[in-house]
Amino acid sequence: NFPFRQQSDLFYLSGIDQEETILVLAPGHPNKSLREVAFVKETSEKIAIWEGQKLSKQEASEISGIEAIRWTNDFDNVLTELMSWATSVYLNANEYPKYFNPVPYKDLRFASELKAKYQLHKFERAAPLLMKLRQIKSDTEAELIRRAGEITGKAFDRVLSVIKPGMKEYEVQAEIEYIFALNRASGPAYQPIVASGINACALHYVDNNDECEDGELLLMDFGAEYANYAADITRTIPVNGKFTSRQKECYNAVLRVHDKAIQLLRPGITIDEFNKKVNTMMEEEMIGLGLFSKEQVEKQDPDKPLYMKYFMHGTAHPLGLDVHDVGSKYDPLEAGMVLTCEPGL
């Protein structure tokens, strides 16, 4: 078994956080009761004993604001009726650019079956429409993300108060997740990275099983999930509480870029443009740190810039119901969007 997490688009549209939920929207249908229908899993005495009570139709309606609530086992009959009326059908799928799974997941299997059965219908992508909606956060969404960030900040403060040489990375992770649970977060928004010493050179190190040694740095990349909304924070601290002079130089170089970069995150700029500007800032700081010279930069291969050896990832990504939330790096930023700012060295 795996922990259940609601599909983000479905949660965004309905607020229903229960497995086997389906949402169908047919706003132009002549029958008003079919224009907006949510299907939820019908409970039983056995399910109630083993899994707990599921939502009633009334509860699902109160949560979602949808009047027409049906049991999931009614879906096929309703779908047949809707398909006899519809011409175009919009289907949902995971369109995250880095997503790859050789085995088709449930939504893709459903799409294939539907296309095979209704070959004369026109099928469209729902993702671009939902992306436009989810990119701009409402006041409520912004507050939930802010709360996730506050809980994450409390976890960071906890680590600052307990970290010492000899502590294990997994003990640090335990402190983080303890604070998450204490503040009613549903857990980490993603697998926490607790990387001491050379482990921090692996961008997505998640073993978290080494000892934090005296004189080393500890990189932590973690975030709480609260009400399905994510935080994402990366910080680096000295294990013994004091930076060496070189560690301080590197830390301050990244901090300067971080502070300047935040000022660039304004409506009108794209994430792609933003990342390029930050790359230039990081390049200048690396020259100042003596990692390479201006002359070497002038002679570098443009396709393999020298800064990539030390800074090989983007600085910002959208944040929301997903840690890497919906949005295109080529679209201009708008007021109401929420993004991370994570330069590193």
Where are these regions (language model features)?
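Active-site neighborhoods and metal-handling regions in enzymes and metal-associated proteins
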Residues: 1-345
